[in-house]
UniProtKB/Swiss-Prot annotation:
Lineage of the species this protein comes from: Bacteria, Bacillati, Actinomycetota, Actinomycetes, Pseudonocardiales
Binding of substrate, residues: 184, 190, 223-226, 234-239, 293, 322-324, 413
Catalytic reaction list: (3,5-dihydroxyphenyl)acetyl-CoA + O2 = 2-(3,5-dihydroxyphenyl)-2-oxoacetate + CoA + H(+)
PANTHER family, per the entry: ENOYL-COA HYDRATASE, MITOCHONDRIAL (PTHR11941:SF54), ENOYL-COA HYDRATASE-RELATED (PTHR11941)
Gene Ontology terms describing biological process: antibiotic biosynthetic process; fatty acid beta-oxidation
CDD domains (alphabetical): crotonase-like
Reported function: Involved in the biosynthesis of the nonproteinogenic amino acid monomer (S)-3,5-dihydroxyphenylglycine (Dpg) responsible of the production of vancomycin and teicoplanin antibiotics. Catalyzes the unusual conversion 3,5-dihydroxyphenylacetyl-CoA (DPA-CoA) to 3,5-dihydroxyphenylglyoxylate. DpgC performed a net four-electron oxidation of the benzylic carbon of DPA-CoA and the hydrolysis of the thioester bond to generate free CoA. It can also use phenylacetyl-CoA (PA-CoA) as substrate.
Subunit structure, interactors included: Homohexamer; dimer of trimers.
EC assignment: 1.13.11.80
Source species: Amycolatopsis orientalis
Name assigned to this protein: (3,5-dihydroxyphenyl)acetyl-CoA 1,2-dioxygenase
SUPFAM superfamilies given in the database record: ClpP/crotonase
Amino acid sequence: MTTDSPTLSLSPGLDHRALAKAAQRVDELLDGLPSPSARTPAQREAASSALDEIRAARTEYVEAHAEEIYDRLTDGRTRYLRLDELVRAAASAYPGLVPTEAQMAAERSRRQAEKEGREIDQGIFLRGILSAPKAGPHLLDAMLRPTARALELLPEFVETGVVRMEAASLERRDGVAYLTLCRDDCLNAEDAQQVDDMETAVDLALLDPAVRVGMLRGGVMSHPRYAGRRVFCAGINLKKLSSGDIPLVDFLLRRELGYIHKIVRGVATDGSWRARVIDKPWLAAVDSFAIGGGAQLLLVFDHVVAASDAYFSLPAATEGIIPGAANYRLSRFTGPRLARQVILGGRRITADEPDARLLVDQVVPPEEMDAAIESALAALDGDAVRANRRMVNLAEEPPDGFRRYMAEFALQQALRIYGADVIGKVGGFAAGSR
């Protein structure tokens, strides 16, 4: 078994054929090695050296040809491919640029510590596409379009006003879409299923003409520590990250560019000339806590009500990953000093302290939550509210700024989830409650 890194002989300005041949040689090296955790130091060095070189070449290639690649994959930007569809199309049309479906299937069968880290190559590709001035905005638009699952469920929801899914349920009452996180066994910890259910629910709420306002709240838990109590969200499911079941494309990126971005911008349609999207006001209600991804969500809602015994945290430093788009949004609410304390230092903010009012609009006793929610929903119900929240969001979060952030996030988060520190930390967390 060789431990020599292949000589790739890559030169600046390489064409796709040369890139594909070099990628094949790297794959042959990796296929001949044991799994990452079983490699000798020499084997690790050989793999790392080869991957560094091919990834530098992939970066150069996609940065030079992003618009051309995207135009080919989308027939001149006439087709709207979602993230997962785009990376699969790229794997077929540009061998060696991103991992093949077979390679990704093999990765999905392994724990995080046993993976080769091929999602990093997807991150390189998506950073290049999102950074491109024409391709990037088109990809954002593609991710704002309703999902096929939502379109299939829409007639049922319009008729009955109820859709129940594994991780979320949606009920329409008096013009309000009540969206409830209902993973009662794991404190609403986030995984790919939750992201799929949440995007479906957000699409339905936005597409249903009878819905005027949306509301998100955590359901009642069966988890022993919070049995009988409502919980908003415990953040990313660290057990699933350790087991290799938190994907870059279908969770970490889809979450940001899918349902969260739709809460901000609305769902894209081919309808009225008045607006390219259907958007509506949203309220969040926080019981018990909003940790990690739960706290990130609060930054995109128009009104937040919290119980006085709740708390908020972004434990990025503890978990080792990037807290979604919180690094982009949080300082607008808190200022840069407090944002750094929360993100870099892991500061927890309780609802009863003054700084909490930078994150939430109302703090009420737990027994008054229902009344406060209904009052706030009534205040959000109006055409003028909808028009003004659209303009506020446009001013506070210009699409190009968000796109540039997400371009870099695509790669940096991919690198983080394969960092040795993250793999070690989540392995320890896996024995905990999430």
